Amino acid sequence: MHEPEPADDVELTVVTMAFDAADPERLLAVLAKYVVLSRMQPGCRNIDLCGSVTTDRRYLIIEKWQSPSAQRAHFDSPGMVEMAEACNGLLTGPPRIELFEGVSAHDLA
């Protein structure tokens, strides 16, 4: 992950991806690999994988990117394509993907 310099402006692009699993065990393996590898991509500030406590078999990836261009580059990357292809047959429907811009963001130095 890129460690921001103290003088860096905080300009975050946040992506959420929600997945409803048909095969939770196999899906978690795909998503965990994606998260670990994506954290090393240029412009990545953080990526977390969460499991819902209110909706069984629902998983959420939360990504924070240094800029909109870093996020776009990642979405066009081989790692993103590989993850999407690996999810084939593991979901009950398409993932819900949302893109946010940081309204109030703070990075700890």
State the predicted function of each range.
Residues 1-46, 50-59, 66-76, 92-109:
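Short S/T/G/P-rich N-terminal loop/turn motif that feeds into the first structured element of a domain
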